[in-house]
Regions:
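P-loop NTPase switch module centered on the Walker A-proximal segment
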Residues: 5-97, 109
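Residue-level signature of catalytic and energy-coupling elements of molecular machines
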Residues: 23, 29, 48, 70, ...
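G-domain G4 guanine-recognition motif of GTPases
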Residues: 48, 117-118, 142-159, 180-196, ...
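Conserved Switch II/interswitch segment of TRAFAC-class P-loop GTPases
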Residues: 85-87, 92-97, 107-130, 137-159
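Conserved catalytic-core segments of large NTP-driven translation/proteostasis enzymes
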Residues: 166-324
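C-terminal effector modules of nucleic-acid-centric enzymes and ribosome-associated factors
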Residues: 3, 9, 18, 150-153, ...
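Alpha-helical scaffold elements adjacent to nucleotide-binding pockets in ATP/GTP-utilizing enzyme cores
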Residues: 29-33, 44-47, 101, 125-132, ...
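Residue-level "contact hotspot" at macromolecular interaction interfaces
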Residues: 21, 66, 105, 247, ...
Length: 404
């Protein structure tokens, strides 16, 4: 007999993020989702109901500054489950000055819900969030046209907004948008179907979240194992870290990058247990058949199949996160998987600087070779950060783009 939690486990975990312009109702939608899916604890429900009608946004607006201003500033993470699936949800800010937080929340998401106020339609920040989702290659994009109750649940309003947004998303290269008319405050089409929009025949938000395919565990993704620690034990070397993608098996021929040395996987250990195979997301230790000079920051990849690129020239799309601008000629640290190297900004496309929350393209030159994949192919080894070499502050988030 299948229990709700075991069923949720079988369906896999979906990582999702919310985004949209300020006051479009993101936190209220998340609160409604948690409330109506019975994912709210009794003490939480009592806390948000003290003034009468529950203020659902308080389920996610946890910071004092957020509560005082009535906005979401930081990224609020929520973990919940239904009988069909587990979820990790990032509720991200809407203000343009907090675009950097939206990048953080959506960078690991497999689905992003972008909210639009039905009264305002698609606005500049809506387009910015759609561009970020496209930049990050988020596999699934949902448009939630919110506050439909304030426009009389008119189908024409929903249709016009959905058409405009879908056309823009198509220009960005997004293959498909799922548009859903909702009222987060009233609960229409969040968990339960709306009684006010019988003209809509699609899924509710929760129905879509429970059934959308999780592509992160695609079996054909090449294995990538960034080495985090080297452990010496009983005259053998073991390499520890988290498998970023794909599957590693005992007996697999592997290449150590960037050195190019080759060997074979002799043993794998996950959580103290010897295994024949390890899968993406698992923390493991690996022993090779040969004693090679492998260090933290090296990357193990199969000797057969698509190989990562070993290069000192990195091109990529970026979102600048720091208050201080990023300029041509600036010296930075590039952090990629478990490796950090010195780098210099060689050029910026169509600009001489990027300021906070700007989107752009950068060309970097690193002091040492970096082992990288195209972000569109393998997100985990295609993402990078630029850091301030003086204090380690994060400056920029980037997505590597390799020559085709």
């Amino acid at each position: 007999m299948s229990t709700p939690m075991s069923s949720a486990t079988e369906a896999g975990t979906l990582r999702l993020a919310t985004a949209g312009s300020v006051d479009d109702g993101k936190s209220t939608l998340v609160g409604r989702l948690l409330h109506d899916s019975k994912s709210v604890l009794a003490d939480q429900l009592e806390s948000i109901s003290r003034t009468g009608t529950p203020d659902l946004a308080l389920l996610t607006d946890g910071l004092r500054a957020e509560r005082e201003q009535g906005i979401t500033i930081d990224v609020a993470y929520r973990y919940f489950a239904t009988p069909r699936r587990r979820f990790i949800l990032a509720d991200t800010p809407g203000h343009v000055q907090y675009t950097r937080n939206m990048v953080t929340g959506a960078s690991t998401a497999e689905l992003t819900i972008i909210l639009v106020d039905a009264r305002n339609g698609v606005v500049e920040q809506t387009r910015r969030h759609a561009a970020i989702a496209a930049l990050l290659r988020v596999p699934h994009l949902v448009l939630a046209v919110n506050k439909m109750d304030l426009v009389g649940y008119e189908e024409a309003v929903f249709a016009a907004t959905a058409e405009e947004f879908t056309a823009y998303a198509t220009e960005l290269g997004v293959p498909r948008v799922t548009a859903i008319p909702v009222s987060a405050l009233a609960g229409d089409n969040i968990v339960d179907p709306s009684a006010h929009m019988d003209w809509y025949g699609g899924p509710t938000v929760l129905e879509h979240l429970e059934t959308v395919p999780v592509a992160a565990a695609a079996p054909d993704t090449p294995a990538r194992f960034p080495v985090q620690y080297v452990i010496r034990h009983d005259e053998s070397r073991y390499y520890a870290g988290q498998l970023a993608s794909g599957t590693l098996r005992v007996g697999d021929p592997i290449t150590v990058h960037p050195s190019g040395r080759t060997s074979t996987i002799a043993a794998l250990d996950v959580l103290g247990t010897a295994v024949d195979a390890a899968r993406a997301g698992e923390s493991l230790t690996a022993r090779l058949a040969d004693e090679l000079d492998v260090a933290r920051g090296d990357l193990l990849a199969p000797s057969t199949g698509p190989a990562p690129s070993v290069t000192r020239d990195i091109r990529g799309a970026v979102c600048h996160l720091a208050d201080e601008p990023l300029v041509v000629g600036q010296r930075v640290l590039l952090r990629h998987t478990t490796r950090t190297v010195k780098a210099i900004v060689r050029s910026l496309a169509d600009a001489d600087r990027l300021t906070a929350n700007d989107l752009g393209h950068v060309v970097l030159r690193t002091a040492e070779p970096v082992v990288v994949d195209d972000y569109a192919e393998i997100r985990w080894t295609g993402a990078f950060l630029l850091l301030d070499p003086a204090d380690g502050t994060t400056l920029t988030a980037g997505m590597a783009e390799l020559p085709r």
